[in-house]
């Protein structure tokens, strides 16, 4: 593995992801304050119904392009790369146009049965963005394979900037009077943003792929097989999982109503959970998202070259770093969740929900990185099977438990299914990579360090985290102390390993 190139790409992706997350969170906060929790609930339900169409259009194609391009470069056959990408373009366009037709024709029925109100227009507004999303997914896989992450970052930044700018302009000029109008203008911004991103990606792709074009360009003979082996199963599995996820999201407000909440209160609770708390919970994952995506081509190359020791080493380090980061993040949300909710949304209830869901962070982040590692090791079908099982179980439990227990039942379902999914995925990864899980080093010691740093800070007479300065100080100081602790623990563990290594024992004898 080219460590320097990997590190540079990781830094570029992390910084771009961080900027994008800040823009997205700022937009979310502004949008939620305009339409309120109930409006956010309606907005999230529309997106939930739209996600299966996105899965049909994009699932698996990015991974297929990455695998085909890295394989061509590994076999010293770069002249087949343009043909491979073109075939993936064709497949993704076919799937996305099919999804467009189905969603456009079914928008009225879906709105009437599941969404309520005048949601069909907002749902149809998202349809033209599907082909753009499909093509962008192909080019994202290409950029990942050639380590051109800055090109992917530029395209994503252009998308977010266009989406936010157009949505804000539409709100300012047209002043939506209803939640349906607000959702419609937001979906218009999202569709235009996808078009801008696709155009930007295509321009950068054309400029870069020219180096692989020559008079001896040959068709990629393995493209059709790769589409059948990777893209098609992934598309079908992701589509099934997205349908289950949509069903899960539709069942949440329905179950809360059956438990005694009014329709308005149930939609508001759902909007606060999915539209306000969950984005905060996933916000720090931008530091891991770039890392997880870069692992796919690196692990694919190691697998193709038979570098088993490299696979084991990278897997162990990835899991350790993920848990170090996620344990600290979870502890921070538990300690300061209420204040963070007040700072971002001016609502203590959102902060309290953030505290209750904070222990999920290690499970969510570990699942993200484990999924990337499994895909790189050609275990994507296993990963999809586990995710589909998880989604099916959630839907069944939502239908049975939520009407009886309300939000408490929802939390129980999230934790139990999260533990099951991570256990299955992690067990498969450990077996494939040939390593064992180090509970003391990866979980217990980080938990102890995070507890000491964050607990100590919370007892000091410092500005409240509900103020911007207080949050910055808390993150900087507790994070710095935690890094020092982690560095010290690493040095001690390395010294112990050195003392008890085979070379040291032989020398002593």
Predicted regions and their residues:
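N-terminal membrane topogenesis motif
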Residues: 1-23, 79, 83, 218-241, ...
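Alpha-helical transmembrane segments of multi-pass membrane transport and lipid-handling proteins
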Residues: 18, 86-113, 312-363, 395-396
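Short runs within selected transmembrane alpha-helices of multi-pass transporters and secretion channels
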Residues: 20, 59-66, 125-144, 152-160, ...
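Helix-terminus/linker motif at the lipid-water interface of multi-pass membrane proteins
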Residues: 22-40, 111-112, 173-174, 239-284, ...
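Helix-loop junctions and terminal segments of transmembrane helices
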Residues: 59-74, 281-305
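Hydrophobic transmembrane helix module of multi-pass membrane transport proteins
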Residues: 97-239, 243
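Transmembrane alpha-helical segments of multi-pass transport proteins
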Residues: 182, 237-238, 243, 439-495, ...
